[in-house]
C-alpha cells in the first residue's frame, strides 16, 4: 500500500528581514507586504534575537548569515570563531598556535616572505582587525623581517568609507610593532567573491602574484583617491602599493575566519586542478587558513572545526525522514554547509537544489534575484509529499539590502512577499506547517545616523511566525497556540522537532517556543521514512 503524502514542516528563512518600529529608511515597513501583514496579525508570532551573546558572538556584535544558520540548525548557541580567535589573541595563545608557529618557522628557514591576506575590518563578520594585529605580533616574536600584508577593504559589514580608518589603524600598529608593510589593497567585491565570478578573483590574484611596482602612494592615499572617484571600500580595484608578490617558497596566512568568501581565492592560490581561469600554480607554497574553508584544500588550519553533534538535519535523518534544502547561489552554503554544522556532505535522505543567482554586478540591478525560481523549486518539492522537513532561504532582503539602495530593497521585499503567498498555497495543499523567520536584520535599516546608506547588518530582532494548515486555507491554530517571548535562533530547531514529534537531543540547549499548555499536534501526521 502506498504511503500517504507527508505533511511537511517548512522552515522559511527570509535572509536579512529584521524588525524595527520606525518606518524611516525601513524597506520592510515601506514595502507592500499583504501576505506577511496578514500572517503577522492572524497567526502566532513573536520576535527572536539574532545577535550578540544570543548567537555566540560578543555582546552587541551584529549577527550574520553564517552564524544565523549555524544556530538555526544546531539548536544551541554555537560559540563563534570570532570569540574563539579573539580570546587567543588576548591571552597570547595565538603566539603558540602550532600551525601558525610552523609556517613562520618555515618562512624564516627559507628566508622567504610571509603574506597575510584578509578583510581589514572591525565588522567581525568575516574577520577582525585585531586578529591581523595579533599575527604581526606573532611575526615579530618569530623574528620575521619580510611580512607582506594584502589588505581587503570591507564597506559591506561596515560603513562604506570606513576602510580608510581601519587601514590607518593598521599602519599605526605596523609602526608600533615594527613588523610588516601593506603591499596591496583590494575591495572585497574582487578578492572575496563567492559566486564563481572568476574574473573578479583573477584581478585580485594577478595583483597578489605578479611583480608590479607601486607608485609611491601609501595605502591610505590610494584609498582616498578611490573615494574621490566615488568608489567605496567594497569596490576598490586591486592595487599594488609596494613590492611583495607571492612567489615560490613563500608562506601565506589567510586570516578570515568565515569560509564562504575566502574559498575561491584559496582555490586559485593552492589547487593544482583549478580551472576558474588560467594561471601558473605557485609551488612550493606554505599555506595556513584560520579556519577550515574546505576539507579539499591543501592547507593547514590554525583553528580546527568544532564538532556539532545531534543537529537538526542529523536528528531528522536518523529517524529515517527525508528532508529538502534549496536556495540561490548566494545563500546555498548557508542552508547546506552552515545549517549542517559545517558538514559539506548531505545527510542520508537529504536532497538539495541550487538555484543560480542572476549574474549582475550588484543585486539592486535585479532585486527580484532568483526568488521566483526558488519558490517554484520549493513548491515542487513540497507537493511531492515525501519530505518531512523543507528548508528554504530567500536571499533578497539581505543581498539587496547590502547595496544601500532603498528603492531596490523595497522591490526585493515585495518580491519575497509575493513568493510567500505561492509557497503557502503549496504548504496548505499538503496540510503542512510553516515557520517563517530570518537569520539577522538588514533591510529594515537602510541609512545610518548621518543619513548615509547603511549596507551592513543590524542587531534588531527578527520575526517568527508559525502557521499550521489543517486541510483548509492555512487557518492554523489561530489564537490557540502562543509563541514564547525572548527566543533565539537556537530555539527554532527544538520547535521544529516538537512539531515533528521527535525527541530533542540533550545537546540541543534551545527550547521549543510553542507554549506547552497550548500545544496542539495533529495525531494523524504521516512521516515518510527512508527504506533501509
Curated annotation (Swiss-Prot):
Q: Which GO terms describe its molecular function?
A: manganese ion binding; phosphoglycerate mutase activity
| Pathway where this protein functions | Carbohydrate degradation; glycolysis; pyruvate from D-glyceraldehyde 3-phosphate: step 3/5
Look up and give the organism this protein is from: Rippkaea orientalis (strain PCC 8801 / RF-1)
Cofactor binding mode and count: Binds 2 manganese ions per subunit.
**Record: residues binding substrate:** 126, 156-157, 188, 194, 258-261, 331
Q: Where does Mn(2+) 1 bind?
A: 398, 402, 457
- Judged by the first EC level, this protein's enzyme class is isomerase
Q: What is the role of the protein in this entry?
A: Catalyzes the interconversion of 2-phosphoglycerate and 3-phosphoglycerate.
Q: For this protein, what is the EC number?
A: 5.4.2.12
* UniProt: Mn(2+) 2 binding residues: 15, 65, 439-440
What Pfam family is a match for this entry? Answer: Metalloenzyme
Cofactors named for this entry: Mn(2+)
Name of the molecule in the record = 2,3-bisphosphoglycerate-independent phosphoglycerate mutase
Q: Which residues form the active site?
A: 65 (phosphoserine intermediate)
Instruction: Tell me what gene encodes this.
Output: gpmI
* Assembly information from the UniProt record: Monomer.
Amino acid at each position: 500500500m502506498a504511503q500517504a503524502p507527508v505533511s511537511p514542516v517548512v522552515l522559511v528563512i527570509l535572509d536579512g528581514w529584521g524588525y524595527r518600529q520606525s518606518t524611516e529608511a525601513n524597506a520592510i515597513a515601506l514595502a507592500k507586504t499583504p501576505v506577511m501583514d496578514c500572517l503577522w496579525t492572524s497567526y502566532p508570532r513573536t520576535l527572536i534575537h539574532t545577535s550578540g551573546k544570543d548567537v555566540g558572538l560578543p555582546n552587541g556584535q551584529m549577527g550574520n548569515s553564517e552564524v544565523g544558520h549555524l544556530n538555526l540548525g544546531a539548536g544551541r548557541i554555537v560559540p563563534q570563531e570570532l570569540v574563539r580567535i579573539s580570546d587567543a589573541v588576548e591571552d597570547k595563545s595565538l603566539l603558540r598556535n602550532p600551525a601558525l608557529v610552523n609556517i613562520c618557522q618555515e618562512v624564516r628557514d627559507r628566508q622567504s616572505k610571509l603574506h597575510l591576506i584578509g578583510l581589514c575590518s572591525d565588522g567581525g563578520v568575516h574577520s577582525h582587525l585585531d586578529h591581523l594585529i595579533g599575527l604581526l605580533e606573532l611575526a615579530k616574536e618569530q623574528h620575521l623581517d619580510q611580512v607582506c600584508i594584502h589588505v581587503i577593504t570591507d564597506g559591506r559589514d561596515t560603513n562604506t568609507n570606513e576602510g580608510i580608518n581601519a587601514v590607518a589603524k593598521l599602519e599605526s600598529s605596523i609602526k608600533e610593532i615594527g613588523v610588516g608593510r601593506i603591499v596591496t589593497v583590494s575591495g572585497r567585491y574582487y578578492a572575496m567573491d563567492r559566486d564563481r565570478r572568476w574574473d573578479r578573483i583573477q584581478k585580485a590574484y594577478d595583483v597578489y602574484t605578479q611583480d608590479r611596482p607601486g607608485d609611491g602612494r601609501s595605502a591610505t592615499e590610494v584609498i582616498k583617491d578611490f573615494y574621490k572617484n566615488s568608489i567605496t571600500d567594497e569596490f576598490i580595484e586591486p592595487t599594488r602599493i609596494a613590492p611583495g608578490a607571492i612567489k615560490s617558497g613563500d608562506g601565506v596566512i589567510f586570516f578570515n575566519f568565515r569560509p564562504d568568501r575566502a574559498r575561491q581565492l584559496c582555490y586559485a592560490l593552492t589547487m593544482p586542478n583549478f580551472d576558474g581561469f588560467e594561471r601558473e600554480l605557485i609551488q612550493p607554497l606554505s599555506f595556513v587558513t584560520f579556519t577550515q574553508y574546505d576539507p579539499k584544500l591543501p592547507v593547514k588550519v590554525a583553528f580546527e572545526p568544532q564538532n556539532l553533534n545531534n543537529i537538526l538535519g542529523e536528528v531528522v535523518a536518523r529517524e529515517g525522514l527525508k528532508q529538502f534544502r534549496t536556495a540561490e547561489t548566494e545563500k546555498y552554503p548557508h542552508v547546506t554547509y552552515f545549517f549542517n554544522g559545517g558538514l559539506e556532505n548531505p545527510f542520508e535522505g537529504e536532497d538539495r537544489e541550487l538555484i543560480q543567482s542572476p549574474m549582475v554586478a550588484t543585486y539592486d540591478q535585479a532585486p527580484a534575484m532568483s526568488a521566483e525560481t526558488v519558490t517554484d523549486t520549493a513548491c515542487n518539492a513540497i507537493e511531492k509529499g515525501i519530505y518531512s522537513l523543507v528548508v528554504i532561504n530567500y536571499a533578497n532582503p539581505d543581498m539587496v539590502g547590502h547595496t544601500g539602495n532603498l528603492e531596490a530593497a523595497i522591490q526585493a521585499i515585495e518580491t519575497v512577499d509575493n513568493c510567500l503567498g505561492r509557497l503557502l498555497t503549496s504548504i496548505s495543499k499538503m496540510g503542512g506547517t510553516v515557520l517563517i523567520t530570518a537569520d539577522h536584520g538588514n533591510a529594515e535599516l537602510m541609512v545610518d545616523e548621518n543619513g548615509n546608506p547603511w549596507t551592513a547588518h543590524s542587531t534588531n530582532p527578527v520575526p517568527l511566525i508559525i502557521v499550521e494548515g489543517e486541510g483548509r486555507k492555512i487557518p492554523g491554530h489561530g489564537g490557540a497556540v502562543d509563541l514564547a517571548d525572548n527566543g533565539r535562533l537556537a530555539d527554532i530547531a527544538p520547535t521544529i522537532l516538537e512539531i515533528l514529534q521527535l525527541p530533542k537531543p540533550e545537546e540541543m540547549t534551545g527550547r521549543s517556543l510553542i507554549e506547552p499548555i497550548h500545544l496542539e499536534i495533529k495525531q494523524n501526521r504521516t512521516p515518510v521514512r527512508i527504506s533501509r
